[in-house]
Structures are given as structure tokens and as C-alpha cells.
UniProtKB/Swiss-Prot annotation:
This is Coenzyme PQQ synthesis protein A. Belongs to the PqqA family. The keyword Acyltransferase does not apply. Keywords: PQQ biosynthesis. GO terms for biological process: pyrroloquinoline quinone biosynthetic process. The keyword Transferase does not apply. It holds the Pfam family PqqA. Pathway: Cofactor biosynthesis; pyrroloquinoline quinone biosynthesis.
Length: 24
């Protein structure tokens, strides 16, 4: 499983946003 695709960046961004909203 390689994370060398734009999906990795998108998933990371989505995860950060989700955590930010969840921590609100």
C-alpha cells in the first residue's frame, strides 16, 4: 500500500479538518 498519490494529501487534509471540527 503506497501513499504516493494526491489521495494521501487529500485524506490528510480531511483528517486534520475533521479533528479540528471535532475538537471544537
Amino acid at each position: 500500500m503506497r501513499w504516493e498519490k494526491p489521495s494521501y494529501n487529500d485524506m490528510r487534509f480531511g483528517f486534520e479538518v475533521t479533528m479540528y471540527i471535532y475538537n471544537r
